[in-house]
Amino acid sequence: MEPKKPPAGVSSFAKSEGLPLKKFAGLFKYRTHVTLSRVPDGAEGLVIGDLARDAGPRDGRPSLLVVCSDGLRMQRLEAALAFFAPDVHVLALPSWDCRPYDRVSPNPVVVARRMTTLSHLASPRERRKPIVVLTTVNAAGQRLPTRATMAAETFAAAAGGRADMKALVGWLEANGFERTSTVRDTGEYATRGGILDLFAPGSETPVRLDFFGDEIEQIRRFDPETQRTTGQLKRLEWVPMSEVTLTPDVVSRFRRNYLSTFGAATREDALYQAISDGRRYAGMEHWLPLFHDKLETIFDYCEGTRIVLDPQVDDALKERLADVADHFEARRDALDDTAPGTVPYKPLEPKLLHLTAEEWASRLADAVTTRLTPFALPDDRLDVVDCEGRQGRSFAAERAATDVNVFDAAISHLGELRAASRRVLLAAWSEGALDRLKQVLEDHGLGRTRRIASWPEAGLLEKGEIGLAVLGLEQGFELEDLAVVAEQDILGDRLIRAKKRKPKGSAFLTEVAGLAEGDLVVHVDHGIGRFIGLKTIQAAGAPHDCLELVYQGGDKLYLPVENIELLTRYGSDESDAQLDKLGGVAWGARKARMKKRIREIADQLIKTAAARLLRTAPRYTPPEGLYDEFRARFPYEETD
């Protein structure tokens, strides 16, 4: 359909007081599908924040649904929005951190965040701010419990109100919470007499509910480390810790759907037996459609919301669809080869849990969409808006040159930007990195600077002042009258980033993939053994992936893959190394001798350190400017 032309007098952008980026001023009311061209990498947070403000608050409904290509881009965009758009409420829906058709469940921390977001969308709390929902291709393409289910499963309690503690504990058990002796992590609960401790999804700290009979006398926040009270609450709401609840009705529905899908269950069918008994089963979320009569997607939760697609979405979608299909085929082929007496894995058809390519196309065709691209597109197209941004200056050539000082080059560039009346931000990954960079550049004539915690504070910058901000950007960018110079533009790539959670199950797979059949390994308790391969065995009525290790005399040890940290690779490639005997004393004796030797070495080191402290020598102070430059080039994150 031909997009409508905006009325006369409506330009591509309109000026907005206090913002460097001109807002989109109702342009999208006349265009269903729009592509924003020349949006440089790193500027997405600024652009999306402005789009959200243009959409405005929608009485609790999302202003934008942003689909990122992967979890890393979603994390970076979330951090960028926190800086560029602190006035926007951000909800994130991450994808499961496990493989399609896996035997493990998603990480509870990931599930808690997903459930918190879905609950907020099903029962809106924030109505005054624009709401941006961030998600990924993997998460957007996966079916979810319905909005009605999420709204019904939200539990509320108030100080002075009445509640049946026994019924509440039953609700926690059915909704994925784990009973522990001491509550420390999200999704845990503990009871002691008339006290219920609970760490609910979406909460920063756990809470303690004091019961007197069926009355909740008080609700207190407490520190999970010290267990000391830190504050009081009048009211508390929490949501399930799992997308699968195990109420009697749900168990009955699962049994009915399972039998109609796969036929009669056998004694070896551990999934069916566990759910029938009301027990949670590792990886049961991969059969989510069997627990529900109906499922929805994030597109249903964000019905009528403009969808923003990042530049790599199309490629990520193709890869995801192929990945799901490959895992399904592998499981189906393995099912045909399942030996009698082993636990079968009966995979569901992909379309039951994941959107098909046709469904994706239909969803996007029916929605109002905005695509972002860093590339220039023909400006005669009515569906293209040119943001006229570009990537920031790279100083790679200056870093490589022996006769050029990269910091002098950076100062020269900053001077050119100020001379052009640009608003300039200098961004670094951490406070320490920003301090070092500022100090070095000041030695080269940086001029006046001001620390800013978020983008609105940039309006306080006086003429010629440079803003200093902690903002994790891979590279800087220029957009309208704003120029952001990133730490990496000047110093090059840093070698360590903030820690990222690996997909559950991928850590051990990566390690196992590095082992070949016949490799020697050392178990911390049992000594040298030989790796045979991976084997799935029955443990506590459920299948478990284990590493098969053989020891002297042919004795075998099956080590669960999640305990692979107990193994190290043997330091020599010699294949004739003597294997230890399971239960023998030789390995323990060798460890004892080694510990004794380590203590002797430690004693020598302590004596050497003491002697060094007693000696004196002239103190040399490095030239301040050169030393600061050396520190600024340090490519690693400093430890605490």
What do the predicted segments below correspond to?
Residues 580-639:
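Charged, low-complexity
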